[in-house]
Regions:
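A glycine-rich helix N-cap at a beta->alpha junction
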Residues: 96-110
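Short, mixed-charge, low-aromatic patches
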Residues: 9-11, 76-79, 104-107
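Conserved small/polar residues in nucleotide/adenosyl-binding loops
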Residues: 113-115
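Structural motif
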Residues: 37-40, 63-66, 105-108
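Positively charged, low-complexity intrinsically disordered leader regions
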Residues: 1-48, 52, 56
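Active-site cofactor/substrate anionic-group-binding motifs, chiefly glycine-
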Residues: 47-94, 99
Length: 115
């Protein structure tokens, strides 16, 4: 699967849920699947449970993880189109994402805002 943005992207939901239940029986059965792969998690909004569960799932798959808390720490990204880049956001999301994609195999985004 190249892009996953909604439940319909899974195809057969029942089959996906059955596979998830099987994986839960032995969480480490695919621990080599993510070997030498990197997951970048981009958070536009804080979520402790989402961050922990996603990071733990990646670790169970053997993946490395990078967490980027946008606009809540040192990293601020502009999301509006056509904005003059003279404020406190030194990078624009549209320019940063291709670079991130060069370094990471999987990018996950949590955003409760329209970007």
């Amino acid at each position: 699967m190249r892009h996953f943005t909604c439940v319909q992207d899974l195809g057969d939901l029942k089959q996906a849920l059955n596979e998830a239940f099987e994986i839960k029986k032995d969480r480490f059965q695919f621990s080599e699947l993510g070997k030498n792969k990197t997951l970048l998690m981009i958070f536009f909004n804080s979520s402790l449970r989402t961050r922990l569960s996603t990071q733990k799932a990646a670790m169970n798959l053997g993946m490395n993880t990078i967490v980027l808390d946008v606009n809540q720490g040192a990293w601020k990204l502009e999301t509006e189109r056509g904005v003059i880049m003279d404020g406190d956001k030194p990078e624009h999301l549209l320019e940063a994402v291709p670079v991130m994609g060069c370094y990471c195999d999987v990018i996950g985004v949590l955003s409760l805002i329209h970007i």
